[in-house]
């Protein structure tokens, strides 16, 4: 796995593990034609796959936030029909919506999408 992609993905995988969500199988797959993109496939236990990527030229915090957004989409699909799909759940609005990955002051954070209140650095849930 590309080192920049690994660095962007590890904090998000930490948050998945902290929530008790099984991490996907990660497979090198340069499916993107963009030379600036570092890409892999995430494979679910049911055999379905999702491609994720980061821009090599983006700042580190933006790579982490972009990866968090894509892994969150994978997790929501994975949880569908089994558990709450509100991952990670917004503490301000329980059962309302999941938090959204954004950047603030050079750090990737999970924030409320309604009022942008930051709650946790990505990787520290």
PLM features per residue range, with description:
Residues 1-2, 6, 59:
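Short, compositionally biased leader-like segments
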Residues 15-63:
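Interaction interfaces in information-processing and related assembly proteins
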Residues 56-125:
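Cys/His-clustered metal-coordination modules, chiefly Zn-binding fingers
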């Amino acid at each position: 796995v590309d080192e920049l992609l690994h660095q962007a993905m590890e904090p998000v995988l930490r948050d998945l593990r902290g929530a008790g969500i099984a991490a996907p199988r990660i497979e090198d797959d340069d499916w993107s034609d963009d030379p600036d993109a570092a890409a892999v496939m995430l494979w679910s236990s049911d055999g379905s796959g999702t491609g994720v990527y980061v821009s090599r030229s983006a700042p580190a915090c933006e790579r982490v936030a972009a990866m968090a957004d894509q892994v969150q989409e994978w997790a929501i699909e994975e949880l569908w029909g089994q558990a709450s799909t509100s991952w990670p759940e917004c503490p301000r609005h329980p059962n309302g919506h999941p938090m959204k990955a954004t950047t603030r002051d050079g750090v990737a954070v999970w924030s409320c999408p309604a009022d942008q209140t930051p709650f946790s650095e990505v990787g520290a849930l």
